[in-house]
Amino acid sequence: MPRPLYLSPDRLFPSDPAQRDIARRLYKAVAGLPIVSPHGHTDPAWFAGDAPFGNAAELLLHPDHYVFRMLYSQGVSLDALGIGNADADPRESWRLFAENYHLFRATPSRMWMDWVFAEVFGFDVQLSAETSDLYYDRITEALAIDAFRPRALFDRFGIEVIATTESPLDSLDHHAVIRAANASGEWGGRVITAYRPDPVVDPEFEGFRDNLARFSNLSGEDAFSYSGYLAAHRKRRAFFASMGATSTDHGHPSAATADLSETQAEALFARVTGEDMSAADAELFRAHMLTVMAGMSLDDGLVMQIHPGAFRNHNPWLFANHGRDKGADIPTATDYVHALRPLLGRYGNEADLTIILFTLDETSYARELAPLAGHYPALKLGPAWWFHDSPEGMRRFRSQMTETAGFYNTVGFNDDTRAFLSIPARHDVARRIDCGFLAQLVSEHRLEEWEAAELAADLSYNLAKASYKL
């Protein structure tokens, strides 16, 4: 017999009764605030074309590497799940997911998925092998209804703005369609882009030289000369800003920065675009370009995000057979104090510059990141990221960052996801965790409740909107 699906109204709140009561009051005031999603990876084609999602597997399984990496770890092949395999039967892929749903117990993925099942699709029984077809049929049938098209869900979720992430090589045609729909009054949803230049900044990115050729064509600049390469970035950044972008994003293997002279930079650029590049050259070029990008952000006002410290594509077989972003990226230990000093030495004192720094290395929270953000005017701390975007990860972030950096050197929450339907669930988790953390401070007489109420609104909405210039 299927087991009931029940979302407790007190989920994630403190178990202490007094703190739980405070958390309830704080949460009640922020639960319905609009969602500001300033960084993520949803597909702008969804909102441009507003075509129906095809089926349950296509919507909830295929885009979510949090889900399929867990299944893969238990021996379920990506081909069987339909990841990059158009011949896979989506119902059978969904059944594999349902049969293995127990693997997600106590994970954030389980919490997000259960929210989607209950709140979006109205299920009151848990997903299992027994209920697999019930789920698949009800979800797939719902997706054929206009109320479940991308734009309708965007509005239903209370999303005020969402940022997607594109490379400089993207034409942004989908964003142009969305902006035209906004201008005509056809749809009011605000979907903006963000400038992620990794394919033309990382010399070890696959197809780097071909990417530079495309970069030249798109910008009208000679991206194989250092001066033309920088001019191409400025042009593409301006184009992205004209399409709504307020931020850039940089996903580097490390947080290394460098501040080279023009002569040094030109010589290095010649090496990384030539035949004699070393791994050290590639790392130095990435490091130098972070500093260059910070300077451009100071000039054009785009907020700069740095997401360092992931060992990308750790599984060579998986990368060769399925490509990137398939759940095989692994956190690494990351230095920030020494690595960021060249960039911060040049631009860290600029109060008009905003650099939002993320980490996958929790050991750096209190030792490095909080002291850095608690000093440099340009530096802010992004929320608990990726593997730490979880109830316990959020609690660790707040407990280790707040005493040194405070709340106002952080930037609220961002969901950073490809899984569109999980966005409200992720924001709800963050709001609940923050209200619980604040409730503890109130109960310990470290905050007044009215201060906690102001903070709850700031952490849920105001800080993200202000930090990302939205």
Swiss-Prot record:
Pfam families: UxaC. GO terms for biological process: D-galacturonate catabolic process; D-glucuronate catabolic process. Keywords: Isomerase. It catalyses: D-glucuronate = D-fructuronate; aldehydo-D-galacturonate = keto-D-tagaturonate. Pathway: Carbohydrate metabolism; pentose and glucuronate interconversion. One of its GO terms (molecular function) is glucuronate isomerase activity. Gene3D superfamilies: Metal-dependent hydrolases, uronate isomerase, domain 2, chain A. Its EC number is 5.3.1.12. InterPro entries: Metal_Hydrolase (IPR032466), Uronate_isomerase (IPR003766). HAMAP family: UxaC. Belongs to the metallo-dependent hydrolases superfamily. Uronate isomerase family. This is Uronate isomerase.
